[in-house]
């Protein structure tokens, strides 16, 4: 069950079932082409679509809405504003409000392990809202396309990687900066070696550098690269091509590829690396006397609050 602004189940004749969304706060949901394409838009542009708990819960509800709709064949995940997503929200007014006890606290901070203490609480919360939900979206019973632009940082990578296909504007950059800014070993859904390659992953995490859309395309991570002013229309045209594929064939193609990658060790590696991620949090919790679950400038890290420039991973530059 998702805790979000989604209305009650509407049971119709002949077993048809749909969910009618009420007003979302952090995302937008709409359908295109007589409902054959669903578009989910991350809608915190001023915060560069940093992911609050409320956004993630609403995103899960929107994915579920599209999955339950038999008319929908393809789901596009996109974003408003200058960036696809700057990662997890680490201290905005919305984030503080959602976390803080009181009438405005988000319900997700009162369940799924939130009431437990110590490492267990963080482990259960991150497993449910950061890790397991991303795995769930990867296996959504629809074909999904991430339409990305601008910065795709850290947890923003997770949202793109859980989609079946990624299309990018020419100005897109991809980076996971949690190593150099938070002293963490990567985000919770550690798809990096599978998406970037093993050595490129080490380079990007150890430096905090980024790669552009063209290099991501060369790696096979990105399917299409479009000019920024053509991204929206070109993505819809791409989705229309895919929507023509019979639904059973499309789903079995997706499952065949996902099961092959899983047989190669993908899911097992994700599970193991999530535990390593939690060990990293526990380390910082001990080092900081329980004050923080990540590192700070005191330990030689970059000040993430200052939003330091992310440099491109150019082969000729140290």
Curated annotation (Swiss-Prot):
Pfam families the UniProt entry points to: ECH_1
Spans annotated as Disordered: 90-110
GO terms for MF: lyase activity
Matches recorded under InterPro entries: ClpP/crotonase-like_dom_sf, Enoyl-CoA_hydra/iso
Keywords from the named record: Fatty acid metabolism, Lipid metabolism, Lyase
GO biological process: fatty acid beta-oxidation
Gene3D superfamilies, per the entry: 2-enoyl-CoA Hydratase, Chain A, domain 1
Signal peptide: none
Family membership: Belongs to the enoyl-CoA hydratase/isomerase family.
Protein name: Putative enoyl-CoA hydratase EchA13
UniProt source species: Mycobacterium tuberculosis (strain ATCC 25618 / H37Rv)
């Amino acid at each position: 069950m998702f805790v979000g602004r989604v209305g009650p189940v509407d049971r119709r004749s002949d077993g048809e079932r749909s969910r009618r969304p009420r007003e979302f706060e952090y995302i937008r949901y709409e359908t295109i082409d007589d409902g054959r394409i669903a578009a989910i838009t991350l809608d915190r542009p001023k915060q560069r679509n940093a992911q609050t708990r409320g956004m993630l819960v609403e995103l899960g509800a929107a994915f579920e809405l599209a999955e339950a709709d038999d008319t929908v064949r393809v789901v596009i995940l996109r974003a408003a504003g200058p960036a696809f997503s700057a990662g997890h929200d680490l201290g905005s007014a919305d984030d503080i409000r959602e976390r803080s006890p009181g009438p405005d606290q988000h319900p997700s901070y009162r369940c799924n392990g939130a009431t437990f203490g110590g490492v267990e609480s963080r482990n259960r919360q991150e497993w449910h809202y950061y890790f397991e939900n991303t795995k769930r979206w990867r296996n959504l019973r629809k074909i999904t396309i991430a339409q990305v632009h601008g910065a795709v940082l850290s947890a923003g990578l997770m949202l793109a990687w859980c989609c079946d296909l990624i299309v990018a504007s020419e100005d897109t950059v991809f980076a996971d900066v949690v190593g150099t800014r938070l002293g963490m070993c990567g985000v919770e859904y550690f798809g990096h070696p599978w998406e970037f390659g093993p050595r490129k992953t080490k380079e990007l995490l150890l430096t905090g550098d980024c790669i552009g859309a063209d290099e991501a395309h060369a790696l096979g991570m990105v399917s299409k690269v479009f000019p920024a002013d053509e991204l929206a229309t070109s993505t819809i045209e791409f989705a229309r091509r895919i929507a023509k594929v019979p639904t059973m064939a499309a789903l079995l193609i997706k499952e065949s590829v996902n099961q092959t990658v899983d047989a190669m060790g993908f899911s097992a590696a994700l599970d193991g690396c999530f535990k390593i991620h939690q060990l990293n949090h526990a380390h910082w919790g001990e080092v900081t006397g329980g004050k923080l679950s990540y590192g700070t400038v005191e330990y030689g890290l970059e000040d993430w609050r200052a939003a330091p420039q992310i440099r491109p991973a150019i082969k000729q530059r140290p």
